[in-house]
Design a protein with these regions (language model features):
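Peripheral (often C-terminal) accessory segments that flank ATP-dependent C-N-forming ligase machineries
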Residues: 14, 147, 331-435
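Internal nucleotide-binding/catalytic subdomain
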Residues: 192, 199-300
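A conserved helix-loop-beta module that forms one wall/lid of the active-site cleft
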Residues: 120-206
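Active-site "cap" helix and flanking loop/linker of ATP-utilizing ligase/carboxylase catalytic domains
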Residues: 26-27, 269-289, 296, 306-368
Length: 435
């Protein structure tokens, strides 16, 4: 893929130049032509920097708006609209195959099925596209898990409000609720959105009316009481190479890695569940990000699984804690030319290899009207405070939070005590960052 000389770049394009990019500084790692050629599907500057510091050739496939940045920073780039689905969708797979690309790595949720479709062509394995659909459609995902003997809660699909009403009543009838007893909550989720997007907890029948018609169809699930956590597992040749347990402090707010000793005590049982997941979904390689619940009596329930980097900058947290690039790890296990020895040598020992505990907190304004960003002293004066990505508000009125909502930015922490980290992250919920 040809790189545009600086002399041919316009001032507008050059305004996008990042002097810290290895490709600009001249420090990019030489590429080994005997190793795989990676296509990164989607957009992540951190993933691009990781690719530049890795020994694999790479190319970025992202929307047209990324073109000037890529040109300015000497990044090999193919523009592609991932929202466009038509009879020309095969073009990108054909073009990447002609380019000599070996594998496509998805960087966000909307590129997972694209990676499946492209890899089915690059690797001549049609089943890979069907597998990617299982990772994108949460109803199909749950059914596949059930077929594999994985424990899940009660779930159904909702196409209209009345479906949710019936489901909520049926779940509570199953739980032998009597008249006057408070209902157990249920959850509704978008079929194909990442993380907390479109995720609502419904506690009363009246709350169902708050769901806009355009959000249907939805997946409905019974509420699982227990300890919710996430896993990031890198898989090569059908086997787990590295398994991180991410501990949620409050869902949608905070997470840290590695987990506390209490949650890590479940590692053997969690590993068995991940091995069952790999077998059930026939996963040969890649990075998976499943979520589970552990109940008080030790039962483990499957929530969902994603085939792309997690939200809340979990890859960056893992790199901070362990020292290896999680993006490079994904490129390594996706690459069909990687050897077992190379993969084994890349990863440190789980938990023991960590240099400390890395966590982050997603900030939501607690006030209806705000005028400025003001970092609380309780946050920035704490010895565990690392950095933040918050910016000044662009408007004074805070929009209503939809479902679990989308945070306004992340605050990062690093320290040597997981209990202090957990308590610190929890305490951030009582602070005002926007005033």
């Amino acid at each position: 893929m040809a790189i545009t000389p600086e002399s041919e770049m316009s001032p507008e394009v050059l305004s996008w130049r990042d002097p810290e990019m290895p490709s600009v500084k001249g420090t990019e790692k030489p590429k080994d032509p005997s190793k795989g050629y990676i296509a990164l599907l989607g957009w992540s500057v951190n993933a691009i920097k990781a690719a530049q510091n890795f020994d694999r050739r790479y190319i970025v496939v992202a929307p047209e708006w990324a073109a000037d940045f890529c040109t300015a920073n000497n990044i090999p780039f193919i523009p592609w609209d991932f929202l466009r689905l038509n009879d020309k969708s095969m073009e990108i797979a054909t073009r990447l195959k002609e380019e000599g690309v070996d594998v496509a790595v998805p960087l966000f949720e909307e590129t997972v099925e694209w990676s499946g479709a492209i890899n089915s062509v690059l690797m001549d394995s049609p089943r890979m596209f069907g597998q990617s659909i299982l990772f994108r459609d949460k109803a199909l995902m749950k059914r596949r898990a059930q077929l594999g003997g994985i424990r899940v809660g009660i779930f159904e699909e909702a196409h209209e409000k009345e479906d949710i009403v019936r489901f909520m009543k049926r779940v509570n009838q199953t739980l032998l609720k009597l008249d006057g007893d408070p209902d157990d909550p249920i959850h509704v989720k978008a079929f194909d959105k990442a993380g907390c997007l479109g995720h609502r907890m419904i506690r009363t029948l009246d709350e169902i009316d708050q769901i806009p018609d355009e959000e249907y169809p939805l997946l409905m699930e019974s509420h699982l009481s227990g300890w919710e956590f996430a896993v990031e597992a890198w898989i090569h040749d059908g086997k787990i190479q590295f398994l991180n347990i991410s501990e949620y402090v409050t869902l949608g707010y905070s997470v840290f890695v590695p987990a506390t000793r209490e949650l890590e005590s479940w590692r053997e049982a969690i590993t068995k569940q991940i091995e069952l997941l790999i077998k059930t979904f026939d996963i040969k390689f890649g990075l998976i990000h499943p979520e589970y619940f552990v109940t008080a009596d030790g039962e483990m329930y499957f929530g969902e699984v994603a085939y792309r980097p997690p939200g809340f900058k979990a890859f960056e947290l893992i790199e901070k804690a362990y020292g290896f690039s999680a993006y490079q790890a994904s490129m390594l296990v996706f690459d069909p030319k990687s050897t077992k020895e190379e993969v084994a040598a890349f990863f440190p020992k789980e938990v023991e290899g960590a240099k400390g505990y890395a966590g982050c907190f997603g900030v939501y304004p607690r006030r209806r009207v705000v005028s400025k960003l003001e970092m609380p002293k309780e946050c920035i004066d704490h010895p565990y405070f690392d950095y933040h990505e918050l910016v000044a508000p662009t408007e004074e009125t805070v929009p209503d939070r939809n479902a679990f909502g989308t945070h306004w930015g992340l605050v990062f922490f690093f320290g040597d005590d997981p209990i202090k980290m957990r308590d610190l992250l929890k305490s951030q919920e009582d602070l005002d960052f926007y005033v």
